[in-house]
Amino acid sequence: MPQSSLQFVTYAIADAMLAGPPEAAAMVERMTLVLGERADWMNGLARGIAKRFGARWDSVDSKELSKVVAENTGFVSAWRGESRPRVVRVLPRPPVQRPPPPWLHGVVLPQLPTLGDLAAWLEVETDELDWFADRWRVPAQSATTPLHHYSYKVIEKRDGRCRIIEVPKSRLRALQRKVLHGLLDRVPAHDAVHGFRRGRNTVTFAAPHVGKAVVIRFDLTDFFASVHAGRVYSVVRALGYPLNVARTLTGLCTNRVPSGRLVAPDARDRIDWQERQRYRIRHLPQGAPTSPALANLCAFRLDLRLAGLARSLGATYTRYADDLAFSGGEDLARMAERVEIRVAAIAIEEGFAVNPRKTRVMLRGGRQQLAGVVVNSHPNLARTEFDALKAVLTNCVRSDPALQNCDGHSDFRAHLAGRVAHAVMLNPARGAKLKAIFDRIVWNLGS
């Protein structure tokens, strides 16, 4: 903006006042330093600002304060006079980390007001931090280069299309884990969320829907890729972090897939145009350790509205990652079609999209299943899940377990152990059979 414009001058005055404590005399001194001379109107402005904003000084920004300056009668008279205020030097406000919002009362977040503080917290140099966060400098057309911070795996979906798993390389992954465990894990998601939260799982997600007349299941399309960098940045800013720190944290936790990778032979014909556009824009990468927690936080308004919808209908709502579940009595069953329309509309308004082909209305007379858990009378292991896991375990006993790792899990043994433990929890008798097969697997064949 022009340095003689009203906006420039009011912002400079606002920054000067914010560059120190909210004491009227001190603010007058700072305004005098910026404008080169003292003026009578400064005293009234400073007293009014101190009284109005002093109690929440750390949360006031330049934009808010500049509007007050522009509306001050003393300043307006001076601006319209023959010798209007003129900025002779700029006094920037030191970076300030604002207190967390009221809904995070009692949550202690790391104090990272500057990029230097962020770099020190992550134990990297500032220029390294810039490199890991500003990946836009890598040519977007190339499929992959040593400069990329991600490697890519193409996983086939059941419908014949594919999903791209974006796996951060070791150094970036280490930084993301620090952000996850040192910052994001401290911020609670909505209470209806059961995915990627300590002490919660698919069983706690499904259990509230046991014994209901109807269970309605929804699936969100491209859950992680739908969360673009702008939404991540807004969440980080809402936590109180200054502009530059929020931008850098956003850069560390988001990615855009190079165009060359999207048109590679293994992906070109299995990703539609809309999906390709999502991947090209900076988004939460499926495969980064920070993505699940950030996705939950970015979906907070979605959960808030859907939980409110459920309450208004006398129903129950839970979410596990991209799986949404509603359940209730006969009244909900009769209005299921209207609920589908309303849920889809709310999802769109909040930046997500329901996949209508995966929506299921499950009545009491048929099998009601959520995330592999049957909920008709009590949480139970679905027969299809039991058979599929038994087949994988049996094949692992008969041949190299690595050959069964079709989804490329980094620790396939731990993955299978988790699935078996889940089965034991849901159905001890069936789970014991799976555990017996798992114990027969020989893991020294390269897996």
Residue positions per predicted region:
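Non-catalytic, polymerase-adjacent accessory regions of viral genome-replication enzymes
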Residues: 1-139
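Nucleic-acid processing machinery
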Residues: 105-106, 146-156
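N-terminal low-complexity, intrinsically disordered segments
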Residues: 121-132, 136, 182, 187, ...
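Glycine/proline-rich, flexible active-site/cofactor-binding loop segments
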Residues: 153-195, 257-282, 289
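Active-site-proximal segment of RNA-dependent polymerases
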Residues: 172-225, 254
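A conserved non-catalytic segment of reverse transcriptases
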Residues: 346-400
